[in-house]
């Protein structure tokens, strides 16, 4: 029996312009809303898992009538108003946020200097964040993690959160830019999802997840089925590299793919 759907926002539930009511091409659609309605009628919880700031995800969760959500790439989890920070040893203290502590470590400067012309802050969405440093460009995140480790910053990692539209400020990239989050190594969407499942008493077989990035695919390890929306593969074919057997690619893009995943999972429950 399906009891919970974990879904990413941008590039998954949301369409062009980050709208619930626009598809990948910008046309009006009700399919994502209908999928949410189907979940409501079937008593299935929907949990948003996003790289967005807490304030943004909180409002999005309220808009769809849900009381649990995951923010800043799994760095934080809120269940029925109770917040849990999942950032390991990096915790807010003495008036400083985790974002401040990461800044003081020198890690953001190291990455931006090393990958100058290939990596920059994701302006303006990098502002007013409490945990992750938000960047865009095109780098090998595994290589970046090794660089951090070599400089004594192995408690952090650079997370690839999927491809975005080209940016004029990065004209020399060899492919479409990606969004990256510099976060504590212990944090992940998969860990946050697993913690929510334990809190609610859900088994993996009772849960599915939907997403469009490599970090989203990591959630496949803790749920019964994972649906990768078609636009993820279109933008970044490498996202399919080494995926587990329970990952399926939808025919639809963005919210159409979310609808497809929900309807399929409900029909087979």
Segments the model singles out, each with a brief description of its role:
Residues 24, 85-105, 159-178, 237-241:
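Charged, glycine/proline-rich intrinsically disordered loops and linkers
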Residues 3-22, 48, 220:
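Asp-based phosphoryl-transfer active-site loop
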Residues 27-124:
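Active-site phosphate-binding/coordination module
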Residues 1-4, 28-29, 183-185, 190-269:
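Mg2+-dependent phosphoryl-transfer enzymes with acidic/Ser/Thr/Gly-rich catalytic loops
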Residues 2, 43, 66, 130, ...:
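A general structural motif
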Residues 13-25, 177-184:
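Glycine-rich phosphate-binding "P-loop"
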Residues 17-38, 228-230:
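Basic, amphipathic juxtamembrane/active-site segments
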Residues 113-223:
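Conserved acidic, metal-coordinating active-site core of Asp-based
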């Amino acid at each position: 029996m399906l009891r919970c759907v974990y879904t990413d926002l941008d590039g998954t539930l949301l369409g062009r312009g980050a709208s619930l009511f626009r598809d990948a091409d910008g046309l009006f659609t009700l399919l994502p809303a209908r999928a949410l309605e189907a979940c409501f009628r079937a008593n299935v919880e929907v949990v948003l898992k996003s790289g967005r700031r807490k304030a943004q995800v909180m409002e999005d969760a309220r808009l769809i009538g849900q009381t649990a959500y995951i923010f800043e790439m799994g760095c934080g989890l809120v269940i029925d108003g109770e917040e849990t920070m999942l950032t390991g040893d990096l915790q807010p203290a003495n008036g400083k946020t985790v974002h401040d502590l990461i800044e003081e470590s020198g890690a953001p400067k190291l990455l931006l200097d090393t990958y100058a012309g290939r990596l920059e802050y994701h302006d303006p969405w990098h502002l007013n964040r409490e945990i992750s440093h938000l960047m865009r460009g095109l780098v090998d995140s595994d290589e970046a993690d090794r660089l951090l480790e070599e400089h004594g910053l192995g408690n952090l990692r650079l997370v690839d959160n999927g491809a975005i539209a080209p940016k004029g400020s990065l004209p020399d990239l060899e492919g479409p830019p990606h969004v990256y989050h510099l976060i504590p190594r212990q944090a992940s969407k998969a860990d946050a999802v697993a913690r929510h499942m334990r809190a609610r008493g859900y088994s993996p077989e009772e849960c599915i997840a939907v997403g469009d990035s490599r970090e989203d695919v990591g959630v496949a390890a803790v749920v019964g089925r994972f649906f990768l929306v078609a636009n993820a593969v279109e933008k970044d074919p490498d996202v399919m590299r080494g995926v587990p057997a329970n990952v399926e690619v939808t025919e639809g893009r963005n919210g159409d793919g979310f609808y497809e995943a929900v309807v399929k999972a409900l029909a087979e429950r």
